[in-house]
Amino acid sequence: MTGVLTAEMNPETKKTCSVPSPEKKTEAEAHTDGSRERKPCPICPHHCNLSEGGIGLCHARGGVGGKDCLNYGDITSIALDPIDKKPLKRFHPGSTVLSVGSFGCNLRCPFCQNHEIATASRRGGQKASPKELADLAASMKARGNIGLAYTYNEPLVGHEFVRDCAAEIRMLGMKNVLVTNGSFCLEPLEGLIPLIDATNVDLKGFTQSYYDWVGGDLETVKRFIARLAGTCHVEVTTLVVPGKNDRAEEIDALAAWLSGLGDIPLHLSRCFPRHRFEGEPTPPDTLYKLADAARAHLKHVYLGNI
């Protein structure tokens, strides 16, 4: 996209969902056109400048042609998946769910398994309307499909499309499943949250230093999980990265916090080298040890990628 300015996150507002004043200049604007009127994006703590010509860190939101959501209806991946793959172990076990993804993500995990679409500005694919996807989901009921899952990239960077699809799915009496990193401010999502039946949230770690590594904010994710736990079925996944978030004390604290929100299943997954992460795979013994620590607080702890 020649001539399109890419915004960076606002370091001054990284740890809060309070939207900065449009008049306030940030370090990010030193790399763009400082004369542009600020239009802070409200959906995540990065608060990128989406004034005309700007594109957010997620690559899916920007001020281009008067549109904030740049990936509306863009489908890069679609498949009928087992519900276990989300992963959701205690929500309609044995069923399948039509799973769709677009492009864009507001984190920068070195180990991302879907980095081709998560970090893309635009990808070739197909266009689909919310009604078209809902009708496709309904046509697959005979194959065990319970609804639509929003996954693969980070779906909430295009929350308007997720909301519109979810409304169509709800009218058909089917289920909406959200797979997300949870690094989002709640107020812009209040119209969507009541439409979600189940979610798996990637709780990347349980220290802010870890979230600094992946480009996010721990407290924002904790608030997101707590809010969703009050309205729908919630499961949580933590990818265990050697030397980063594999201390028993950290997983113990994470599980203790989750237990205060209710009966939330926790998935501890093994990490393998991919994308920009060149470390060793997580030793299976580490996962077994961490699962024991988590089970001191939680009834349902599962291991993945073993």
Set out the residue ranges of the language-model regions.
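The canonical Cys-X-X-Cys-His
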Residues: C109-Q113
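Conserved AdoMet/S-adenosylmethionine-binding subsite of the radical SAM
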Residues: P130-T282
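Active-site beta-to-alpha loop of glycosyltransferases that engages the nucleotide-sugar donor
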Residues: G104-L107
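Short, conserved glycine- and acidic-residue-centered signature motifs
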Residues: P93, Q126, D217, P283, ...
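Short, flexible, glycine/charge-rich loop motifs used to bind or transfer phosphoryl groups or to couple energy/partner
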Residues: H47, L88, A138, E187-G191, ...
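Auxiliary Fe-S-binding modules of radical SAM enzymes
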Residues: M1-G53, P242-I306
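A short alpha->loop->secondary-structure connector
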Residues: I117-K127, M171
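N-terminal [4Fe-4S]-dependent radical SAM core
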Residues: G3-S102, H115-T119, M140
